[in-house]
Amino acid sequence: MSRVGKKPVTVPAGVTATVDGQNVKIKGAKGELSFRVPDLVEVSHADGAISVQPRSQTKEARAMWGLSRAQVANLIEGVTKGFEKKLEINGVGYRAAVAGKVLKLSLGYSHDVEYEIPAGITITTPRPVEIIVAGIDKQRVGQIAAEIREYRGPEPYKGKGVKYSDEFIFRKEGKKK
């Protein structure tokens, strides 16, 4: 039984939630998000809370139960607080800068890497070695942060590259003579 799915998601003041069949629409101060709940679970909205129940007790339905409840909770958190991922750049000459709707990364290649910032996402660089990806959709924020990190992932010898700010890089020892 899903321990996550059992708890109903409370809808805070200032947030409107509408459930139309399998579609959940959440509207808040930061924007509007929607999610289609899988057919294996049913969703209901009552008394200022959204609850999710499995239609059957199959393993697949129980898995979708917890997933759907977590997705709805993420929608509510996204339209109220938003999400952000912080990235750090380590390496001599490695830097980032935002120019209009483009993130320019100097990562040791013969050319600068240009990443076009998608709509609904804000990318800021408080310092040349720090990138903050923010938005209301948790999945998109994480995906974009992963795409930026992928341009030059951290290497294990000197730790050069782009890494998440809370990520620990296991260091390897170099060759011994």
From Swiss-Prot:
GO terms of molecular function: rRNA binding; structural constituent of ribosome
Entries under InterPro entries matching the protein: Ribosomal_uL6-like, Ribosomal_uL6-like_a/b-dom_sf, Ribosomal_uL6_a/b-dom, Ribosomal_uL6_bac-type, Ribosomal_uL6_CS
Record keyword RNA-binding present: yes
GO cellular component assignments: cytosolic large ribosomal subunit
Domain of life according to the entry: Bacteria
One BP term from GO: cytoplasmic translation
Keyword annotations of the record: Ribonucleoprotein, Ribosomal protein, RNA-binding, rRNA-binding
Gene3D superfamilies in the cross-refs: Ribosomal protein L6, alpha-beta domain
Function: This protein binds to the 23S rRNA, and is important in its secondary structure. It is located near the subunit interface in the base of the L7/L12 stalk, and near the tRNA binding site of the peptidyltransferase center.
Quaternary structure and interacting proteins, as annotated: Part of the 50S ribosomal subunit.
Family to which the UniProt record says this protein belongs: Belongs to the universal ribosomal protein uL6 family.
Protein name, entry field: Large ribosomal subunit protein uL6
Encoding gene (name): rplF
